Amino acid sequence: MQNHHHQQSSYGGGYPGQAYREQHPPPNPYGYGQPSPQPGYGAPPPHNGYGQPPSGYGQPPPPTGNAVYGGRQPGMNQYQNTYSHGHQGGPPPPPTDPVAFGHGAPQGYSFQYSRCTGKRKALLIGINYFGQKGQLRGCINDVKNMSTYLNQNFGYAREDMVLLTDDQQNPMSQPTKANILRAMHWLVKDAQPNDSLFFHYSGHGGQTPDLDGDEEDGYDEVIYPVDFRQAGHIVDDEMHRIMVRPLRPGVRLTAIFDSCHSGSALDLPYIYSTQGILKEPNLAKEAGQGLLGVVSAYARGDMSGMVSTAVGFLKRATKGDEAYTRSKQTKTSPADVIMWSGSKDSQTSQDAQIGGQATGAMSWAFITALRKNPQQSYVQLLNSIRDELATKYSQKPQLSCSHPLDTNLLYVM
């Protein structure tokens, strides 16, 4: 079991997170001792969790048209300016119209970038595994740093963030498997085009033999809830099914994984590094297998098309067509899903231990790079993150995406 994990090295005085905590003492009104207030977590939640949380959790902004964050955020104007900055010689903002997948996909098969001007919600999970073998040190700090950064710099309100950490008294705020899955559903529920959702996981990651044949290396990536010994792990396929598949065109989900073997933790098909594109799907082949029809019917809201395609799936699958049974559905999405992670899937658990891949490296480098220059393109940010990581770690950053990404566009969130 433990050979799937890295052991976190003692950070001593060198923990990189200290650097940005010292530069910007976060004015956290709740203090780091207590959890931030989380409506819907106090009492056992009604309607199986996040259905109808109390006030402030999911209220639409007032119908003024210009109050981007429901009028709550004093820093709103400064953040909205991203777009005007983008034209002054900086990277261009994302296009507002749908973009074709191209690369052999059927005509009309498209996705949409999010302008990230809508509602914002964040789910941050940090697990130190207190009292368990393989206890980690910095994971809870990672997500507290990230929540402060999102709140101060990107207009994420505290009441629209859920933090699951294993130092909290409230059982609903413990990062158990049930709580994590429930929170993932809450995160994506009712998301609209141009919303910006954020997911951060800091804890143990590992690999398990891939049962559905969709991973090239024969392993699925997994994350380990605090109660994994009783409840089991959570596989990348399940995270994709809950957090990626339901998203409509134009919804952004940004994910950051601070864990070993997180390179494909959301099962996204396009992977970019500082060197350019590392991996892209064979869409012509997927189209030939009928895999792309389901997504585009879903994106159009054409449920009748979806049902008939799905029935076609079943018929062919029962004939034993291996490709159909294997890659149940394409991993592309009409939404705008991106994921930042360190290193590569191919890194073995032994390499991870020898390389001392430290939990927290990715989120620390992400925050540090954006603090130094908030106006970067995707490829500039990849390079900035690589430069930050190179000062302390051997791992390289990679950016995975649900669609082909124009890496020269302005990075927005």
Curated annotation (Swiss-Prot):
Regions of compositional bias (Pro residues) in chain numbering: 36-47
GO molecular function, one term: cysteine-type endopeptidase activity
Family matches, as SUPFAM superfamilies: Caspase-like
Entry keyword annotation includes Hydrolase: yes
Compositional bias annotation for Low complexity: 49-58
Family annotation (Pfam families): Peptidase_C14
Comp. bias regions, Polar residues: 75-85
One CC-aspect GO term: cytoplasm
Root EC class: hydrolase
Annotated catalytic residues: H204, C260
GO BP: apoptotic process; proteolysis
Region (Disordered), start-end ranges: 1-104
EC number, UniProt record: 3.4.22.-
Gene3D superfamilies named in the record: 3.40.50.12660
UniProt keywords, alphabetically: Apoptosis, Hydrolase, Protease, Thiol protease, Zymogen
Family affiliation: Belongs to the peptidase C14B family.
The name this protein goes by in its record: Metacaspase-1A
Lineage, opening ranks: Eukaryota, Fungi, Dikarya, Ascomycota, Pezizomycotina
